[in-house]
Structure formats: C-alpha cells, structure tokens
Design a protein with these regions (language model features):
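Extended active-site and interfacial segments that coordinate phosphate-rich ligands
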Residues: 19-47
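Small-residue-rich helix-loop
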Residues: 149-252
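Short alpha-helical scaffolding segments that buttress acidic/His motifs in well-ordered protein cores
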Residues: 92-93, 119, 140, 174-181, ...
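Short, small-residue-biased leader/transition segments that mark boundaries at the very start
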Residues: 2-4
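Conserved phosphate-binding loops in nucleotide/dinucleotide-binding enzymes
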Residues: 7, 21-32, 60-92, 96-104, ...
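Charged substrate- and nucleic-acid-binding regions of tRNA-handling and nucleotidyl-transfer enzymes
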Residues: 235, 239-301
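Short conserved beta-strand segments at catalytic cores or DNA/RNA-binding microdomains
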Residues: 8-20
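Structural motif
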Residues: 79-87, 126-132, 164-173, 250-258
C-alpha cells in the first residue's frame, strides 16, 4: 500500500529484491523520480551496481486525473472482456507516452515483432499521455479488418452464439460483419433480430434515398414473394438470390434499393443491419425469409 511505500523498509526491501533477481533495468512511472536518490544510496551502501532507470509519464484519464482501476477505469482484462483484441490493446498502449521515430514516425499499426524491433526509450515523451477510447476503438477496428475471414469467424463466433440460437449462415454473416465491426463485444446487439422479429413501426419503410414509402414497400414485398418462393432459387448462393431480385427490379423499372431496402426492414425490423436484404435472406434461409416477408405484408396491410 501507499503507507508502506513511505517507510524506509519498503525502499530497503525493493533494492534487495531487485538485486537478488538480477534486475539491470527498471521501467516505472515518473512519480518515482523523487525516490530514486534513496534507492541509489542503498545500492551504493551495499556496493551493488545501480540499475538503469527509465521513468515513464503517467497515463491520464483527462487533463486532471490519472487513469486508475481504483476509480473504475478499464483494465486490460476489462477491455478484452468487452471484445478488444489483445494485439490492438498492446499496440495502443505502446503509443501512450511513446512515439516511433524515423521511417516509422507516421505509422500507427504495428505487429509485436515490429514493436520489439523499433521500440527505444528515446521515443518516450516527458508529457503525460491521455487515454483516448476512440483512438483505441479505431485501432481495434483496423486489427479486425486485417484478420483473415477464418480468423475473424473464430473470434466472432462466441459473440454470435451468445445472441443467435437459430440456424444461420455464419460464414456469410461474418463476411458482412467484419468490415462493419469495431469491437467484438458489440456483435450481439447487432444480431438480436435473428431469433425473434422485433416490434417496429411501418414508418421505418420510408426512405428518401431509396424512394420508398410504406405503400411502395408493400408493393415491393408482394413482387419479391414469388421470386423468393421459387424452389429453384438457391439460398445458399447469395449472388443467385441477389441476381433474381435485381431481375425483378429491372422488370418493374425500379432501382435495386426500391426492392431490397424494404426486404431488409421486413427481415430485421431495423434500418441498419450486418448486410443488405439479400444477405439477410441467405443468412436466415428460405423458410424464415418467406415467413417474415409474409408477416411484413400483413403488417403493411394494417
């Protein structure tokens, strides 16, 4: 505790412990600068070599307060539990109070081998660093985008399984999630419509960009119903489903969005989803898709 750190026995024990462990370099917070002379005197009294000290600036929550778990600030374990990748957290922490130099000066994303290669104490700042959650989020999103599809699915599946218990095409879902995902822990809230259709207002079908209204949405879904009911249509082939819907839009003289925007609402009850209407249809499969389209038409009939 802080009480013991103020006692001579703490400094004494610290010096003895470090010496017995063969410590040659000590990296610690700048708040220990004032106690360094005491440590040095003890080393000299014992006739031991004084280690090399590197004092780092504190990490601040804001301009006045230090980041502290005692005050409820997130620890590494908390961040990982929320769905941040270990590599992203490590990358961001390395940039707190330290900056790369030379050819790496403008680079922000580093692999662990790169950090081992380029890190040097000369890049340590003398000024405190402020923990920026948005910056960490951006770095985490970049790490997620750089994962292979297989790696992303492996990391995302526990979060998907916690939210979706019905049969879905996980591979297609992950292909749509990966470019949109910033933090793995936010995946479940994006998927809550798969197991149960949420309540929604038909005004959600109105979209100026897609030129849709609740009235045109009913027309669009009625036009799509026979297309999606065709037994020859393979819901395991996303391109085939999209092409079939696109052909219907061309037949009606409409833009794709005029048909597909209402389809997305009918299947999810949401305006923002991990994928467009045909993506959702393929993830859910024919049976669920047809049931929800029919329910949407009935809802629009009022």
């Amino acid at each position: 505790s802080d009480v013991y750190k103020r006692q001579p026995t703490y400094n004494f024990a610290n010096v003895v412990d470090d010496h017995l462990m063969g410590i040659t370099h000590v990296i610690r917070g700048s708040e220990y600068l004032s106690s360094t002379p005491k440590y040095n005197l003890l080393y000299q009294a014992f006739g031991w070599d004084i280690p090399t000290y590197i004092h780092c600036p504190p990490v601040m929550k804001d301009a006045q307060n230090k980041l502290s778990k005692r005050n409820g600030d997130a620890s590494y374990q908390d961040l990982v539990a929320k769905g941040y990748l270990t590599e992203a957290v490590l990358n961001y922490i390395c940039l707190l109070g330290w900056s790369p130099r030379g050819e790496y000066a403008e680079q922000e994303i580093f692999s662990l081998p790169e950090l081992v290669k380029i890190w040097s104490p000369e890049g340590i700042s003398k000024s405190p660093a402020i923990f920026d959650p948005l910056k960490l989020r951006a770095i985490n999103a970049e790490y997620i985008r750089r994962l292979s599809p297989e790696e992303f699915q492996k990391k995302a599946e526990p979060w998907i399984d916690s939210a979706v218990h019905s049969a879905i095409d996980k591979k297609l879902l992950c292909a749509n999630l990966q470019p949109r995902c910033e933090v793995l822990g936010e995946i479940p809230e994006q998927l809550d419509f798969f197991d149960a259709m949420p309540e929604y207002d038909v005004s959600m079908y109105a979209n100026k960009k897609q030129k849709t209204t609740p009235e045109t949405a009913k027309e669009a879904l009625e036009a799509l119903l026979p297309v999606l009911s065709d037994e020859a249509l393979d819901f395991g082939n996303r391109d085939a489903v999209f092409d079939a819907c696109k052909a219907k839009a061309e037949e009606l003289g409409k833009k794709n969005g005029w048909l597909l925007y209402p389809l997305g609402i009918a299947l999810s009850g949401k305006q923002r989803t991990p994928g467009g209407g045909t993506d959702l249809a393929c993830m859910m499969g024919r049976e669920t898709t047809l049931a929800r389209v029919k329910a949407a038409i009935e809802k629009l009939n009022g």
